[in-house]
Amino acid sequence: MTQKATPQTVLAPFDDVRLESRGRRYELTRSGDRFEVNLVDPDWESAQIGDGRESSAIDREAERHRVTRPVVMTTGSHHVQGYWIPGDRGNLLRQIPWYFHIAEQRWMPREDAFLEPPRSPRHFITWNDNCLTCHSTGGRPGMSKTTLEVQTEAAELGISCEACHGAGRKHV
């Protein structure tokens, strides 16, 4: 299910968890009802990759570009759960590159959860153009032509009956 991140919907432990994969460190914390991730700024790193910079050059600078972002949304509730943080433009959402395996109660790096060619460059999944159409109802990706800010809308988070069957009518 796609849901707002709350103590009731976040299934993974966030209490001072430290995760490491492929040279990157992720620090997860919880303070009351707020969940946060400290990581290399995915907006900065995505821009560096998009500009064609060598991964070794990016790696040398990465630690200087750490940010702490709140977890604002979750996807998944049956087998694995993913977590989303705000990006730098409008309502852009980026997924942290870890999934929580619910049955095994453990974290797993996203790049190890899917088949990819060896030495594939790091990439960043965005909700707004990648997951929105299947994991929401009435999802409409959008962007301001003047500010280039992401302006995504959804009638409802999650996959409701109307997502597949069209506009709802009174149930009989």
Where are the regions that the model predicts?
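Mature N-terminal segment immediately following signal peptide/propeptide cleavage
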Residues: M1
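A domain-level signal for the mature, folded cores of soluble proteins
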Residues: K4-R25, G32
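Extended surface/linker regions that mediate inter-domain or inter-protein docking
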Residues: R22-V172
